[in-house]
Regions:
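A structured phosphate/pyrophosphate-recognition subdomain
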Residues: 2-19, 29-36, 113-197
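Anionic-ligand anchoring segments at beta-strand to alpha-helix junctions in alpha/beta enzyme folds, i.e.
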Residues: 9-76
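Active-site cofactor/cluster-binding pocket
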Residues: 60-117
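Residue-level recognition of the N-termini of beta-strands and the immediately preceding loop/turn
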Residues: 41-44, 81, 149
């Protein structure tokens, strides 16, 4: 699957898994940046689940990177639209059952989720790397977007234990390529230690 295949849809909802982590947020944000660069697209990042985002590092990441995510009720039906699940697979246990007329799955975990479009790369350390790679294949470079670069970097960092589990060249390429804020990454990381949850 390539991202430009999904440009036929004007109403696009991007859903990370319930209780999203930094990689899920960064992945959703990357798709949001890509699709909103095209005129006439109504794009929203939505999530559901038992609770709203509360962890300090995630709240700070959303604020500092300006990730426009909103909570919706379980079983929301978006009607004639495309729903893209990121860092998870539609129909599996870690993601609420939101619906739309078409479903796309973009993930770096093996799974059995069913969708009309599917891109799964279990060899990568993060879904952020997969989204970054899909954007690069479209010639969509994010060199000047430090907020997205920071989100991607932090997403991979947290999903790979501070890069200890990075083994694929694409993960390394993303680390070397994106422009990110070292101070923000440190701020997010330290917030888990210093701020009460």
């Amino acid at each position: 699957m390539i991202l430009s295949q999904l440009l036929e849809y004007d109403n696009i909802y991007i859903q990370p898994h319930d209780n999203p982590d930094p990689d899920a947020l960064a992945s959703a944000f990357g798709l949001y940046v890509y699709f909103t660069s095209y005129e006439g697209k109504n794009v929203k990042i939505v999530y559901s689940g038992r609770s709203k985002i509360q962890k300090s590092n995630l709240v700070l990441m959303i604020e500092e990177c300006e990730i426009p995510i909103e909570y919706v009720e379980k079983d929301t039906d978006f009607g004639d639209a495309l729903l893209i699940t990121v860092d998870c697979q539609h129909g599996e246990g870690n993601v609420s059952n939101l619906t739309a007329s078409k479903i796309a799955i973009i993930d770096h975990h093996q799974g059995t989720g069913v969708g009309d479009y599917r891109e799964v790369a279990p060899y990568l350390g993060s879904c952020s790397t997969l989204i970054w790679s899909l954007m690069m294949k479209e010639g969509f470079f994010i060199d000047d977007n430090t907020k997205l670069g920071t989100a991607f970097y932090y997403g991979l960092m947290t999903d790979t234990g501070n890069f200890m589990e990075v083994s694929h060249p694409l993960d390394r390429d993303m680390i070397d390529s994106v422009k990110y804020s070292k101070s923000l990454v440190k701020y997010f990381t330290n917030s888990n230690i210093s701020l009460p949850e």
